[in-house]
Amino acid sequence: MFSFVDLRLLLLLAATALLTHGQEEGQEEGQEEDIPPVTCVQNGLRYHDRDVWKPVPCQICVCDNGNVLCDDVICDELKDCPNAKVPTDECCPVCPEGQESPTDQETTGVEGPKGDTGPRGPRGPAGPPGRDGIPGQPGLPGPPGPPGPPGPPGLGGNFAPQLSYGYDEKSTGISVPGPMGPSGPRGLPGPPGAPGPQGFQGPPGEPGEPGASGPMGPRGPPGPPGKNGDDGEAGKPGRPGERGPPGPQGARGLPGTAGLPGMKGHRGFSGLDGAKGDAGPAGPKGEPGSPGENGAPGQMGPRGLPGERGRPGAPGPAGARGNDGATGAAGPPGPTGPAGPPGFPGAVGAKGEGGPQGPRGSEGPQGVRGEPGPPGPAGAAGPAGNPGADGQPGAKGANGAPGIAGAPGFPGARGPSGPQGPSGPPGPKGNSGEPGAPGSKGDTGAKGEPGPTGIQGPPGPAGEEGKRGARGEPGPAGLPGPPGERGGPGSRGFPGADGVAGPKGPAGERGAPGPAGPKGSPGEAGRPGEAGLPGAKGLTGSPGSPGPDGKTGPPGPAGQDGRPGPPGPPGARGQAGVMGFPGPKGAAGEPGKAGERGVPGPPGAVGPAGKDGEAGAQGPPGPAGPAGERGEQGPAGSPGFQGLPGPAGPPGEAGKPGEQGVPGDLGAPGPSGARGERGFPGERGVQGPPGPAGPRGANGAPGNDGAKGDAGAPGAPGSQGAPGLQGMPGERGAAGLPGPKGDRGDAGPKGADGAPGKDGVRGLTGPIGPPGPAGAPGDKGEAGPSGPAGPTGARGAPGDRGEPGPPGPAGFAGPPGADGQPGAKGEPGDAGAKGDAGPPGPAGPAGPPGPIGNVGAPGPKGARGSAGPPGATGFPGAAGRVGPPGPSGNAGPPGPPGPAGKEGSKGPRGETGPAGRPGEVGPPGPPGPAGEKGAPGADGPAGAPGTPGPQGIAGQRGVVGLPGQRGERGFPGLPGPSGEPGKQGPSGASGERGPPGPMGPPGLAGPPGESGREGAPGAEGSPGRDGSPGAKGDRGETGPAGPPGAPGAPGAPGPVGPAGKSGDRGETGPAGPAGPIGPVGARGPAGPQGPRGDKGETGEQGDRGIKGHRGFSGLQGPPGPPGSPGEQGPSGASGPAGPRGPPGSAGSPGKDGLNGLPGPIGPPGPRGRTGDAGPAGPPGPPGPPGPPGPPSGGYDLSFLPQPPQEKAHDGGRYYRADDANVVRDRDLEVDTTLKSLSQQIENIRSPEGSRKNPARTCRDLKMCHSDWKSGEYWIDPNQGCNLDAIKVFCNMETGETCVYPTQPSVAQKNWYISKNPKEKRHVWYGESMTGGFQFEYGGQGSDPADVAIQLTFLRLMSTEASQNITYHCKNSVAYMDQQTGNLKKALLLQGSNEIEIRAEGNSRFTYSVTYDGCTSHTGAWGKTVIEYKTTKTSRLPIIDVAPLDVGAPDQEFGFDVGPACFL
């Protein structure tokens, strides 16, 4: 249990760590100052800063910056333990082993006789965790970890409501631990601590009731001063000040957020023609056509009734051997066959069942002393011996698994610097210089006199920007900014708990009949009709040509048994039979096996030499021979290619000084070279003549800060900052009074799928679907399934005797026979070999404790322990050893130039030239490279006060506000009628809180509103601590069966039931196979000592038997008494939402329920629209004072209200939820959030196709719900908001998504009169005919813009599309002209990408016709069904049709436009 002392100690340590961290930062900033180490002295002992020690067992002290801070250890109260003991050097008492409270002791009668050992009970439930053991001695300090990253900013000093947990009357302040920093990397393991004293073994206690809060501890010492906190949040804006003069232009603002998506672009150019599409779905049933030619033979009809018996046919050829039939029933036993040849000796049979216990034999002679048996099981633990002398230190164990990260330790002292790392690799090679011009071979001349100074070059480019000057002193506070824009409404709250079901409303009046719905989708194919009567017998046809060999049919039903055949040849060797009874003693055996191989004999004499062998294969090449003598000089080779520049050689020796050369002519100025490394400073040159004044250089680096200027005039208020993030929800207010009864909730989310229902009654046969398009001729089909077995024919005549079949497979071993009678006692055998060690005997009684043994040798290295619990925060360790050298550094810069080389060999002497005169001054050189950055200039004088700056850009969004104070208990409002959700209005300004009104009478229940959209999931709350168990609720009604949850943890075993009656002995099943080795069970308590059995003889090791048959299931035992209820298992994952159930029958109205707990605060709502700009306000009074200075050592909590002192104050109140209601609320919030989240995730993973949860395409729906029927569903191909979802028809057989036109049929009438009826041309219906229109899609009431966007996405996600159009005609040719036999008068179709689709031409742009009834002018109405199928999905849907054969007064037409289907 986390005691108050722990908390105070934790706070003390956290404060120390904060202080230390601040000191380290301070040390780093001013490292030049040498600060002497701070120490503390107590009782004559000196302690370093941050040392922690216990001067007495019940006191703990820390050295804090020279001050000793001590605190008392407060112990937990031990209940029911009169003889508590305080261990040596410890402060808190513990209860010795075996001592129980008086209530547990009962009087006992005389001890009865010892019963037989009972069977081993089932494994008991895990006991509750025992109490914490006595703390061990502190371990040696570990090496210091590396410094952690800086902690998060501390809380400001004015957040009292959040910190009121550590209240103390006497304290003027208290420091609060910051959140835990991330753990540093793991340090080296410290040396093992000294072993703690042996703890007493506590009896496992019952789980106790939660104890009352302990008494309040004494006041802790004042914490060290905290690190300066970050600046507090800005105060509330003051009233606007007077308008200041406009300031200078502000810095450029951050880039704005991305703009809204732009307007829809212009229509793109037509794409290339796509490939021909696939056939669309079948159109509605056409009118009857004229009888067609005979169709291709149809599929095989259902099996007819059996015909008359035919004449016997000629015997067919022998068929291929059929598959083995199913094993027939066992025939009657045949006559005994002749004895087969003796079989091979079988393998050793499985070990037989033990025979019945034989009579005890006479005592045998004393056997040879057996090898020591395996160690028996550990006996019961003896009483603890006296502690032995300390053993040798054991070998270091392997590192344990890393424990849970402990609280971070205090930072250790800084270790000494590591040794110098190895030198870095040599820097990269410099670029080679350009080749010099070849000099004349003269001796080097003496150094000439310096030439005249050249003209000053133009000024170089501006140097780099100087370092940023030190930060100026803060200017005066600016005017307060205008009030921030109103924050958006918060996100939607979590769904409240379900309200109690309201009474059912009265039935409404019957509505008027609705308008006729749109034409239904084609029904599913009807079931096959009943078999027709058999037709009259046809004439015998001519024999057909032999067909191809069919596939082997499935095996027919087994025929009747034939007569028994003659005995077959001896079968293959069967499996070993069951072990027979022991036979009589056999005759003496044959001589034994040959002995083991003898020792090798002595080597024989050397034999004569053999013949020469054949020449061997070519050997591997030999090693290289010695180098030959040097050959003569060869002719000079042709010059090679220019080689790469070689690496720089070692510097040569310095050459001798040459003679003075002739000055050369002045060269033209070279191009500006690359900037060289900074050279060493040269000697000071002669003072040159002053150069002309250069242009003004760039500004130098800013000098040090000048004296503080006068305060500038206040700047204009900055633009409004973005509203801060929504603060954490304030602490929950107390529960309100119960509100009136709520409306009946909407139907809950779809439940998990129920168990499959019973088969329903067969539905009526559906209407026959429209004819599908003709498919391409299929490949030859595989043999169909075998037809049902015909009636059994008359028994055939017996066939000829077949050849003996192959021996069948060996049958399974039969069941083992009953136990045989015990055989006669055999003669004593020869003395057997020494037997294996027998099984371990039963554990002997516990002996008295032995004398203390000698110290044993160190044991072997132990197995790796399991990860221990996280340790308490360790004390700071001593400084670590110097670390190993660091890794090699990065390559260093190129080194300085090497020393002068050795003297070179002297070149041939050149002719001495005449002395030249000094050259003229050359033209000015090009500007030199930018100079190195200059040192900062001296401080400039204080500048004049600047003019105020312009309004700054809006500040960044403020940090999340701290949780508000706990709200007052609210009054329940009247439930209003739930209206439809209104459009989101701009949020009004928040009014001041009015006084609570009087409680109104409960309102009438409003009608249920539509269910709101699901809120976004809230942020994941931190897991609450375990709450105390709530009161038991009333029993709920049985819910629908959920899906089976994950298997719960095994419940605690019930008590042992009464012994059943002894059953008859079952037949012994054969031994099952050895199971896998189970995990080692927990060690059970030692059973009582059983009577000692006689030592059995060691049995021989049998071979492993074959796996036996599965035994029969035993009878079901009587039910045991109910076990105690197990702990509640974790909630199963939320199942997928089931389909919406049918409405239930009306229940009787329930009683008015109490109001449920208020739902958790919802996540923030979507941001509201920006309000209109208000009028500019008048300038306000001066702004609020600036942010507070850094806080002192603690937080001043003296202004908090005095807490009631009747009960001890719970110091961890705000850290721990010990209040059951708080826990319940928290759990409710978490559960609600989890349910909402899992529902949303389930909806994303498995959409329902509803308007609220649309699928992306029908193909997605089919994959998620393969058993759903075809019909209308909602899809949202572009995802995002579901308000633009469209309703489509999903063909669940194929996964096609079919989008219907908004107007599926065009009236049949005369649409067009041509001015010149003889001149025929294609006329577009939507573009050129009066009253015509281009076809739009998406069903009634959908927004065409939404549909266009959704179709674009649907096309992208589809690979093929198809559509049908039916053209109704009267005296108008649609496709084939019967008079001419050509397609000149065929219709044109226009696709979505404005491409024309024709009846003939390029096959990728042609449609097909499945039915053509408009081929001539008959004066009657006909129709032609056009189908277009393509993989270029951008061509569909069709938006216009152009007939050619129209324009006369007697020519009429109309269309039916089918859906465009995408797959």
UniProtKB/Swiss-Prot annotation:
Q: Name one GO biological process term.
A: endochondral ossification
Q: Where in the cell is it found?
A: Secreted, Extracellular space, Extracellular matrix
Q: Which residues carry this modification: Phosphoserine?
A: S171, S270, S786
Q: Which cysteines are joined by disulfide bonds?
A: C1258-C1290, C1298-C1461, C1369-C1414
Residue positions with a glycan: K264, K1107
- The biased composition feature labelled Low complexity covers 197-216, 278-294, 317-330, 378-417, 494-525, 537-563, 572-591, 633-660, 695-723, 783-797, 810-837, 852-882, 930-954, 1077-1091, 1125-1149
Q: Which residues carry this modification: 3-hydroxyproline?
A: P884, P1163, P1178, P1181, P1184
GO molecular function annotations of the record:
extracellular matrix structural constituent conferring tensile strength; identical protein binding; metal ion binding; platelet-derived growth factor binding; protease binding
Q: Which residues bind Ca(2+)?
A: D1276, N1278, Q1279, C1281, D1284
Region (Triple-helical region), start-end ranges: 178-1191
All copies of the Fibrillar collagen NC1 domain together span 1228-1463
Query: Which residues does this entry mark as bearing Pyrrolidone carboxylic acid?
Result: Q162
Q: Spell out the SUPFAM superfamilies in the cross-references.
A: FnI-like domain
Amino acid composition bias (Pro residues), ranges on this chain: 138-153, 332-344, 839-851, 995-1005, 1041-1056, 1176-1191
Concerning PANTHER family, the annotation shows: COLLAGEN ALPHA (PTHR24023), COLLAGEN TRIPLE HELIX REPEAT (PTHR24023:SF1082)
Q: Which family does it belong to?
A: Belongs to the fibrillar collagen family.
* Protein name per UniProt: Collagen alpha-1(I) chain
Chain's gene name? COL1A1
